[in-house]
Amino acid sequence: MAVPKKKTSKSKRDKRRATWRHKAAVEAQKALSLGKSILTGRSTFVYPTPEEEDEEE
């Protein structure tokens, strides 16, 4: 069975987790912001709908 040679230090582990959590928080904030702008109608984002895709074919 594969086993790591040495234990990863707590500080290295915490740094990695902090990086992952920060990236996840940034993406969540972007998604929330986009959702809010779509709901308020202030966005220039065009959400693709199935009807538009059928017309192109």
Curated annotation (Swiss-Prot):
Pfam family name, one: Ribosomal_L32p
| Record carries keyword Disulfide bond | no
Q: Name one GO biological process term.
A: translation
Keywords (alphabetical) are: Ribonucleoprotein, Ribosomal protein
Q: Name one GO cellular component term.
A: large ribosomal subunit
Coiled-coil ranges per the record? none
S-S pairs = none
Q: Enumerate the residue ranges of region (Disordered).
A: 1-23
Q: Which Gene3D superfamilies match?
A: Single helix bin
Q: Specify whether Ribonucleoprotein is a keyword of the entry.
A: yes
- GO MF, any single term: structural constituent of ribosome
Q: Which family does it belong to?
A: Belongs to the bacterial ribosomal protein bL32 family.
Q: Could you tell me what this protein is called?
A: Large ribosomal subunit protein bL32
Q: Tell me what organism the protein belongs to.
A: Nostoc sp. (strain PCC 7120 / SAG 25.82 / UTEX 2576)
Q: Print the organism lineage.
A: Bacteria, Bacillati, Cyanobacteriota, Cyanophyceae, Nostocales
Which gene is transcribed and translated to give this protein?
Answer: rpmF
